[in-house]
Amino acid sequence: MYNKLQYISQGNTIEDQVRNIHQALDSGCDWIQMRFKNQTEKDSFILAEEIKLLCEKYLASFIINDNLYLAQQINADGVHLGLSDMKIDEARTILGAEKIIGGTANTFEDIQNHVKNGCNYIGLGPFRFTNTKEKLSPILGLSGYFEILQKMKKNKIEVPVYAIGGITLKDINPLMETGIHGIAVSGIITESDEKKILIQQLNEKLYANVIV
């Protein structure tokens, strides 16, 4: 099963991205999603190569946001696809059965389609408004997560669901009670001056009910 905490990278330059990702890894994060929008192919490739090496050093999983061909080119662990990106089944055909494919969802119907087409995990959101992403889908809130997770249970759909969108430390307990598997976060880690302490606190809450 996948780790419960995923860091979605931030930074407008290669240097910013590397620094932010390196700090997240060094502070205990073991799943990185590289998100480097509106960049040249060359810069995206340079960054991905560097981050792959870092993730290998820290024994962390490494997936790439939206760019399936880059993920294939550098042999990343997988890719995360948005609602307007390549279809999940097409991505599965290209990447093969072993790679991780995550899909963004805003509704129960989105999840149904993703799972049917071979998605490994769902990034469900947004939980609340966030400046990290443009063109947000409708805000879900706790009630939205509860309703969608209940529909999944009723329809016997079992796939790890990650909450995303403006999540803070105090949100984790009520979110986990809805039945999600974990969270995918950006700003809370990037902007923290005490990343090790924060990631430890996040993981303590995320894994609170896990029996080892």
Swiss-Prot record:
One Pfam family, short name: TMP-TENI
GO molecular function terms listed in the Swiss-Prot or TrEMBL record: magnesium ion binding; thiamine-phosphate diphosphorylase activity
Enzyme type, top EC level: transferase
Catalytic reactions of this protein: 2-[(2R,5Z)-2-carboxy-4-methylthiazol-5(2H)-ylidene]ethyl phosphate + 4-amino-2-methyl-5-(diphosphooxymethyl)pyrimidine + 2 H(+) = thiamine phosphate + CO2 + diphosphate; 2-(2-carboxy-4-methylthiazol-5-yl)ethyl phosphate + 4-amino-2-methyl-5-(diphosphooxymethyl)pyrimidine + 2 H(+) = thiamine phosphate + CO2 + diphosphate; 4-methyl-5-(2-phosphooxyethyl)-thiazole + 4-amino-2-methyl-5-(diphosphooxymethyl)pyrimidine + H(+) = thiamine phosphate + diphosphate
Residues forming coiled coils: none
One GO BP: thiamine biosynthetic process
Superkingdom classification of source: Bacteria
EC numbers on record: 2.5.1.3
Residues involved in Mg(2+) binding: D66, D85
Keywords: Magnesium, Metal-binding, Thiamine biosynthesis, Transferase
Cofactor remark: Binds 1 Mg(2+) ion per subunit.
Pathway: Cofactor biosynthesis; thiamine diphosphate biosynthesis; thiamine phosphate from 4-amino-2-methyl-5-diphosphomethylpyrimidine and 4-methyl-5-(2-phosphoethyl)-thiazole: step 1/1
Residues that bind 4-amino-2-methyl-5-(diphosphooxymethyl)pyrimidine: Q33, M34, R35, F36, K37, N65, T104, K133
CDD domains xrefs: TMP_TenI
TM stretches of this protein: none
GO cellular component: cytoplasm
Cofactor: Mg(2+)
UniProt entry tagged with the keyword Metal-binding: yes
Chain residues that bind 2-[(2R,5Z)-2-carboxy-4-methylthiazol-5(2H)-ylidene]ethyl phosphate: T130, N131, T132, G166
Function recorded in the entry: Condenses 4-methyl-5-(beta-hydroxyethyl)thiazole monophosphate (THZ-P) and 2-methyl-4-amino-5-hydroxymethyl pyrimidine pyrophosphate (HMP-PP) to form thiamine monophosphate (TMP).
Family statement: Belongs to the thiamine-phosphate synthase family.
Name of the featured protein: Thiamine-phosphate synthase
